[in-house]
Structures are given as C-alpha cells and as structure tokens.
C-alpha cells in the first residue's frame, strides 16, 4: 500500500522552464498543487480510485494492473483472507503451505500459543500444531484393533494374510494404491485429505516448485513472499550463504538478500553514483557553491586546482595538453614537482623552500586570487578582501609596519622573519618570502635613505607629490609635517617586486632554472617570464634602457589613492635601494592597466568601476532585475546576468541585502549565491 502527499510545484524548478509536466490521467498541464506517484503526476481531482472514484490524495491506495485502487476495493477484488478468522489481511501476513494467517491468528490449535520463531509446525488436516504438542500426541503404544477389521480401500473385511496400517487405517497390501495412477504403494507416499498418492502424481497435482531450481519440493520448504525454495537453494545473492530457520530475508524480484547485505549494496550503489557524477569531485556533504568545494585536474602527472589551471597565462604550450582527467580531491594540500616543491603541511614554513619554488607558489597564488576574486587588481595597494590600505602620508618619513594583514582561509599562518630588526611582531602570513636572497622577489624597505644623491634624484617627484596634497594658495613648511601625515604603514598583499639582473649572465640563469625545473607548470611559468622580458625590451611604449629612463619609469610606482576613506600615500621608487640599483624593470600590463611613463599618479575611487572588476554597470531598478520563470519579466539586454546585483544602486542594494557592497563582496562565493537566490537575482 502506498501513500502520497500533494506538494506545491516550485516556480523556480529547472524543469518548469523547458519540460511541461502533464497530468497522467487527463493529459492537461499541471499547475499549483499536484500529486506525484511513481514518477507520474496527477491533478488532485484526477487522482481517484479506478473502481469507486473516491479521492486517493489523502488516503492509502494500491497499484494493480496499471490501476490505482482504494483499500476497500482492492480487498474485495484481490484481497487475501485469513484461514483462521476469514477476514481480509492488511499489513503483515504469515504464509505456511499455501495458507495465509494474521500474525495473531497463527497459533497452535491445541495450546493456543503463538509459534516461536524458527519452530517447526505440524499440520494435521486443517489444524496446525506446535512441536511440543505434536510430541505429546505421538504414542509408542501399538494401535489396538478391536473386532473385525475392514480394508479402507475395498471396504471388505480383512480375514487372512497381511494387513497394512497407514493413515490410521488398515489396508490390504494390494489395496493401498495411488489415488491417481493406481500403483501399489510399497515405499514412500504422500497423503492429502486422507488419500494416498505417489510422489510424482502428488507433485503434478498439488506440488510446489522451487523458485531457484524449478524442481518440486518434498520435505522441508522455505517460503518468502509467496515463493517457495529448498532450504539449500535459498541463498543470498551477495554473500551466497544459506538462510537459517527464523532468519529475516529480503526479496527483490527473484533475488533474495540478507538484511545486512541489502543495506551494504544500497550504500555501494549510492557511493558509485556519487563517484561517477560531477559531485564526486567535491567533498562529501557539501553543496554547490560551498567554500570546501574542490575540483582538481591532472596535467602532465601533476595535480592542479581548476582555478589554478584556468588562471594560467594563455600560452600555446599550455592549451596543447590533453583534456585534464577528473580525479578525486585531497583537501588542504597543493602539489607541484617532487623535486621543486614538497608537500607543505600546516606547520611547515616557506623559508625552507628554494627561490624557484617560492616564485612558483607566488605565481600560482596570484593567479588563483585573480580568477576567484573579480574585484582584485594586481597592485601594491589592493587587498583581496577589499580592505582599505593605509600608508604613510608623507613622502619624507616612513615607518616600518606589518608586511601583510591578510590571512589565507585554507592554510594556517606561518612564522616569517622580519626584514628589519624591530620589537614589533609582524602578523603571520603564508605568502611572505624567505629571508634569504631571492632574485625573483624583494620586499620593499620603507625607510628614508641617508644617501644624498638618491634624495636629490627623487626631489622633483617628492615636491610634486607633496604639493598635490594642499591647495594652490597654501605653501607648507618644508620642515614641519602635519599630524595627519603620520599613518602606520600596513603592507599590501602584493609587495613590489625588484628584479636584479646581472650584466652578462641573465640568460644563462634562466637556462639553468629551466634545467632544474622538472615540473611542467614551473617550466611554463619561467617561459612566460622570459617572453615578457624579451617583449618588454622591444615595446615602443617603454623608455630606452638607461639609468635615467629606468628611474623615470620607476617613479610611476607612486600612488595617490582614496579607498573607503583611507589616507593617500606616495611611494617613490628612489627611496628603495633595491629598486634604485636595478638597471631596468620590465613593464607588466595586467587586467587592462597600461601605465605609461607619464602617468605619475593613479587615482582610485571606491565608487568607480574598479570596484566591479573594471567594468561599468548601468543602474536599473530592482523590479527590472528580478528573475522569474517562463520569461514573465524580461531582463534588459545590456545587463550581466551573472552579476545582476551590480546593477543596483547603493540604496537599493542595502535594502535588498541588508549590507553594503563592500561587505557583500567580502562574503564567500556560496554565501553570496544563497543571498542572491533569496533576492531572486540569481
């Protein structure tokens, strides 16, 4: 018997848009509340009994011969009666030798006690007797025959010769025959209703066949679900073991299962389906958009996160590899070449890695942050979480501060060595390079130089930066700095890189690096660096290679920014001895930021398009951006359907999500998607 509960068809169901759900009974389209039974849908008014027409949506029903029938009609048509009380049986049923009983009616005919599980049952005509009562009925004393004896077969008196005692009656030896074929029974026989039969005739007329071997069963029989088996033929399809007396068994079609084996098979089927589906790559129990969702790929015997693979530069050699194989994930770990990068545990420090390994880690982390965060820009003053950078306002005074205030959500924070001796303990950060020499990355040293020549060369840029902070009518005292100019410096997530190349052996260094790196991804990254260096020298927008022009180009690294009300800063390249000593610096152009040597300052506003990934988003009312089914509300043509929330004004954004845009962007991706679904903007 089955039950069904009506449910509301969701208007946001993915099936509602393309596949129309039709009623199984009338064929019309289902709208509103419907009933689903065996993958068939019905209107509530159409889901009725096939016999009497009563509603089945709120009651039990039976499915027989492709018809849905109520309980009463099913019992009248196909119901089973108890052999003891003659009532219809619903629920549990006990079958024995073709007879069915209620569990409460299947008791011993003599002692009226229920049969113990696994106990033997003796049938005597229409009575069933337990094993204890059957032993008391059996007597070892011979049957006393009083008076003349008559044959039960020919009804004549037995006078001379031998007589046969069978079925509690006396027979002539020649009269004890099979009722069907009249063969004299001298050996085993089977009786039914007091009439003897030979074994073959009894099986042909009343016999029971085994479902497994298709042979007749004589002796002990095992019955389950209306099917009969030899005790040795009923075996579990999984473990191939026999069933003991009284043991529970599951019947699926023609297969018999132990309860434990059936549960194990269901678990394996679910696990196999999970591994073969797309969600097998994600952690168990996670939902789509969860931060723990990890999809990995295998390229050239290396395991890469799909974000890392998608964020790699579009080099021809990368896209010539075969399609990545989907593999199972291992959370909180990253793999590169065995010779270059070892598996970093939570307690290991990056200071133990080689400079080449650090550079590969930094490139992979940078590309991963670019691909995962749309508002991130590769600049010394932008943070991945969109936090406001704080710099020293004055170009004449620098105070050393923490190198980074970010923390990685998937890695524990590691100890780093401070570049300058100070009593202040810098916050721990996974991406800080080692304290040893590294030609691919040098952290800037924020302090004033004592070198007079360096200060003279940067005087012009400093005056311009200093004058830009005051009105034209005001001339500040050069020996006095206002209180607002002293801001504690917090390092940016991406410190400027200073590359120092030797005059004669820079190409040889790259060749040696290429030979050392056996990792395919590491070799591709170094090839990209060499290609960028060679193209930067031939770039017509890059100044000639001279000490003067390189210093002029490096002046463009000074920034004047105002991000969420944070103080502006001026960082001049001449104040850093590591950068001022370099011969030239290749020009990097990423995310569309092409900075020319004449652009000394880069203005950033928290309200401009940079916050939304360098794209202008036209503002629309919230009602025009709602996502509905079947195209009832058509979206404007120029909107970004994957970023509908970015077309809202600040006031409507706060009314819809209850938070500002910057707070919304700091949320995890899965959390943002959930909020957008609730607001019908997803």
Curated annotation (Swiss-Prot):
Superkingdom field: Eukaryota
Modified sites of kind N-acetylmethionine: 1
Annotated Gene Ontology cellular component terms: cytoplasm; glutamatergic synapse; lamellipodium; stress fiber; synapse
Gene Ontology MF terms: actin binding; metal ion binding
Compartment(s) where it occurs, according to its Swiss-Prot or TrEMBL record: Cytoplasm
Phosphoserine modifications at: 277, 280, 282, 286, 290, 337, 372-373, 379, 388, 492, 502-503, 566, 575, 606
Known tissue expression: Expressed in heart, brain, lung and liver. In the brain, highly expressed in the olfactory bulb. In the hippocampus, expressed selectively in the CA2 and CA3 fields. In the cerebellum, expressed in internal granular cells.
Residues with the Phosphotyrosine modification: 376
Region annotated Disordered, chain positions: 372-426, 440-475
UniProt domain LIM zinc-binding: residue ranges: 21-80, 80-140, 149-208, 208-268
Residue intervals of the HP domain: 614-682
The keyword Coiled coil belongs to this UniProt entry's keyword annotation: no
Skewed-composition ranges (Polar residues): 380-393, 405-425, 453-466
Pfam family, one: LIM
Modification Phosphothreonine, positions: 542
GO terms classed as biological process: cilium assembly; cytoskeleton organization; lamellipodium assembly; positive regulation of transcription by RNA polymerase II; transcription by RNA polymerase II
Keywords (A to Z) from UniProt: Acetylation, Cytoplasm, LIM domain, Metal-binding, Methylation, Phosphoprotein, Repeat, Zinc
Residues the record lists as Omega-N-methylarginine modifications: 630
Oligomer status and interactors: Directly interacts with F-actin and ABRA.
Annotated function: May act as scaffold protein. May stimulate ABRA activity and ABRA-dependent SRF transcriptional activity.
Name this protein carries in UniProt: Actin-binding LIM protein 3
Encoding gene (name): Ablim3
């Amino acid at each position: 018997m089955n039950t069904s509960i009506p449910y509301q068809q969701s208007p946001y169901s993915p099936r509602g848009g393309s596949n129309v759900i039709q009623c199984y009974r009338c064929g019309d389209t289902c709208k509103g509340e419907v009933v689903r039974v065996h993958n068939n849908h019905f209107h509530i008014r159409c889901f009725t009994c096939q016999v009497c027409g009563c509603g089945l949506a709120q009651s039990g029903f039976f499915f027989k011969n492709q018809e849905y029938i109520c309980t009463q009609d099913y019992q009248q048509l196909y119901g089973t009666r108890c052999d003891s009380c003659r009532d219809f049986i619903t629920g549990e049923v006990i079958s024995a030798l073709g007879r069915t009983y209620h569990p409460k009616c299947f008791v011993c005919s003599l002692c009226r006690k229920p049969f113990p599980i696994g106990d033997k049952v003796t049938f005597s005509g229409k009575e069933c007797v337990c094993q204890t009562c059957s032993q008391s009925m059996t007597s070892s004393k011979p049957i006393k025959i009083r008076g003349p004896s008559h044959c039960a077969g020919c009804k004549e008196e037995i006078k001379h010769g031998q007589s046969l005692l069978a079925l509690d009656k006396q027979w002539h030896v020649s009269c004890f025959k099979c009722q069907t074929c009249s063969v004299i029974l001298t050996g085993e026989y089977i009786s039914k209703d007091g009439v003897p039969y030979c074994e073959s005739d009894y099986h042909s007329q009343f016999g029971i066949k085994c479902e497994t071997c298709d042979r007749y069963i004589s002796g002990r029989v095992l019955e389950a679900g209306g099917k009969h088996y030899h005790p040795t033929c009923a075996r579990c399809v999984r473990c191939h073991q026999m069933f003991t007396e009284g043991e529970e068994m599951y019947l699926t079609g023609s297969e018999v299962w132990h309860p434990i084996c059936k549960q194990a098979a269901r678990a394996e089927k679910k696990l196999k389906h999970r591994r073969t589906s797309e969600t097998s790559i994600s952690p168990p129990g996670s939902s789509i958009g969860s931060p723990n969702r990890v999809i990995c790929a295998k390229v050239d015997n290396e395991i890469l996160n799909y974000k890392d693979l998608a964020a790699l530069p579009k080099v021809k050699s990368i896209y010539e590899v075969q399609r990545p194989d989907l593999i199972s994930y291992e959370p909180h770990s990253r793999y590169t070449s065995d010779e270059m990068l070892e598996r970093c545990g939570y307690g290991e420090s990056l200071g133990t890695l080689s400079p080449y390994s650090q550079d590969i880690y930094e490139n992979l982390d940078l590309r991963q942050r670019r691909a995962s965060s749309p508002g991130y820009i590769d600049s010394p003053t932008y943070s991945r979480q969109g936090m406001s950078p704080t710099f020293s306002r004055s170009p004449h005074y620098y105070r050393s501060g923490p190198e980074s205030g970010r923390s990685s959500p998937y890695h524990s924070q590691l100890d780093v060595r401070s570049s300058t001796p100070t009593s202040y303990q810098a916050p721990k950060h996974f991406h800080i390079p080692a304290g040893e020499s590294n030609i691919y990355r040098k952290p800037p040293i924020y302090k004033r130089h004592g070198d007079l020549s360096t200060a003279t060369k940067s005087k012009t840029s400093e005056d311009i930066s200093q004058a830009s902070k005051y009105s034209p009518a005001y001339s500040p005292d050069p020996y006095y700095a206002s209180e607002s100019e002293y801001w504690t410096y917090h390092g940016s997530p991406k410190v400027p890189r200073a590359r120092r190349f030797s005059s004669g052996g820079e190409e040889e260094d790259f060749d040696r690096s290429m030979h050392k790196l056996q990792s395919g991804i590491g070799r591709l990254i170094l090839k990209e660096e060499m290609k960028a260096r060679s193209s930067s020298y031939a770039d017509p927008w890059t100044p000639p290679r001279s000490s003067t022009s390189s210093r002029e180009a490096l002046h463009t690294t000074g920034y004047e920014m105002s991000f969420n009300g944070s103080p502006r800063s001026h960082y001049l390249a001449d104040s850093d001895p590591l950068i001022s000593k370099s011969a030239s610096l290749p020009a990097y152009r990423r995310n569309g930021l092409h900075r020319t040597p004449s652009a000394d300052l880069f203005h950033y506003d928290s309200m401009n398009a940079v916050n939304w990934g360098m794209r202008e988003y036209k503002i629309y009312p919230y009602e025009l951006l709602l996502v509905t089914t079947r195209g009832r509300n058509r979206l404007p043509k120029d909107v970004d359907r994957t970023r509908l929330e970015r077309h809202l004004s600040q006031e409507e954004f706060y009314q819809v999500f209850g938070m500002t845009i910057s707070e919304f962007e700091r949320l995890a991706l899965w959390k943002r998607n959930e909020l957008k679904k609730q607001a019908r903007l997803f």
